[in-house]
Design a protein with these regions (language model features):
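Start-transfer (signal-anchor) and selected internal transmembrane alpha helices
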Residues: 1-33, 146-149, 156, 165-166, ...
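Transmembrane-embedded, aromatic-rich helix segments that form part
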Residues: 191-192, 214-216, 229-247
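Short helix- or helix-capping micro-motifs
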Residues: 29, 167-172, 199, 220, ...
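Transmembrane-lumen/periplasm boundary regions of multi-pass, lipid-linked membrane glycan transferases
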Residues: 32-35, 52-88, 103-114, 122-125, ...
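Membrane-interface transmembrane helices that cradle and orient dolichyl/undecaprenyl
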Residues: 158, 162, 197-213, 223, ...
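Transmembrane-helix motifs of polytopic, lipid-linked glycan transferases
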Residues: 134-158, 196, 200
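Transmembrane-helix signature of polytopic, membrane-embedded enzymes
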Residues: 20, 25, 124-130, 151-173, ...
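Short acidic/glycine- and proline-prone juxtamembrane loop motifs at membrane-interface regions
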Residues: 47, 176-189
Length: 294
């Protein structure tokens, strides 16, 4: 029995076979990524992942003013860090703020996410820093399943349902994707939002609304937030807006007017400002403590 649906996978108002095949692919992808999630049995063999858990643990203890928080890990070298939730003045002071991770190889948002979920988990049970892998790794797995879905959407957009499903299936079974999903690192999140950014670029070209540029900026900021080395993604942003100028005049260069360029330039500026804002919110001390960041 088919269910009535207005979903993009529907055909004539009925859920098509494509939906069910994609659902199977996503379920298989999730199962592969969650299998063996406790692969290191708590020994934290991955150094970057270990740093994220331990720094987020120390930050959580400092924010909650736990006894001995200033003697926790990296905080021993930060005697000016003030315990408790920061006020506005403390928040913008790189030395006193408890939210400054003093560590920038990877995006600060990864640490903040762990602190946020730690505060929720602690409402129900005590948990140590390394046991937060039971939260971090499933989040990474879910992000990579989102990547599988985005691969389908892009493949479908470019070449049709068959290619979209084939690409999603290969991505679901890709060893490197499955491996990265077993670490709480930036790769799975950055890939997801990078693909989502490409989808948003396409959407912006089709709909040409200011809202679509805002969505594009948001997704670009989320792509860069976990890993600053993704900054080159801004190059396609420039190209896609220039393509939009040409598309508006159907490729006739002589019809390009200053007013048209200014209007589309304003859309591009909005996307850039939102992307920069998202990055600042997710990693404020990359700017406030820029000497340590660079």
């Amino acid at each position: 029995m088919a269910f009535r649906s207005d979903h993009f996978l529907s055909f004539g108002g009925r859920v098509s076979w494509v939906f069910y095949v994609l659902l199977v692919i996503l379920v298989v992808a999730l199962a592969l990524r969650l299998n063996g999630i406790n692969w290191d049995q708590g020994f934290a063999f991955h150094p970057d992942e270990r740093d994220i858990y331990m720094r987020s643990g120390c930050m959580y203890e400092l924010l909650t003013d736990s006894p001995g928080a200033n003697d926790c890990g990296y905080l021993r070298g930060e005697p000016d860090a003030q315990p408790g939730l920061p006020g506005i003045g403390t928040l913008f002071d790189k030395d006193r703020s408890p939210l400054n991770p003093h560590w920038f190889p990877l995006g600060s948002i990864l640490i903040y996410v762990m602190v946020f979920f730690r505060s929720i988990v602690e409402l129900f049970t005590d948990i140590n820093s390394l046991d937060m892998r039971y939260v971090g790794r499933p989040l990474s797995a879910l992000a990579d399943v989102g990547t599988v879905a985005m691969v389908f959407l892009l493949g479908r957009k470019l070449y049709g349902n068959g290619v979209g499903l084939l690409a999603a299936g290969f991505t679901a079974l890709a060893v490197i994707h499955i491996q990265n999903s077993h670490f709480f690192r930036p790769e799975t999140f950055s890939v997801l939002f990078t693909l989502a950014s490409f989808w948003a670029m396409w959407r912006m070209l089709e709909r040409k609304r200011l809202l679509d540029s805002a969505i594009l900026g948001l997704l670009l900021g989320l792509a860069i937030a976990p890993k600053i080395s993704l900054l080159p993604i801004l190059a396609p942003l420039f190209l896609v807006y220039w393509y939009r100028v040409l598309d508006e005049v159907e490729g006739r260069w002589s019809e390009i007017t200053p007013e048209l360029v200014q209007r589309i330039f304003n859309h591009a500026i909005l996307a850039g400002v939102i992307a920069a804002g998202v990055f600042f919110i997710s990693a404020p001390y990359a700017i406030l403590d820029i000497a340590a960041f660079v």
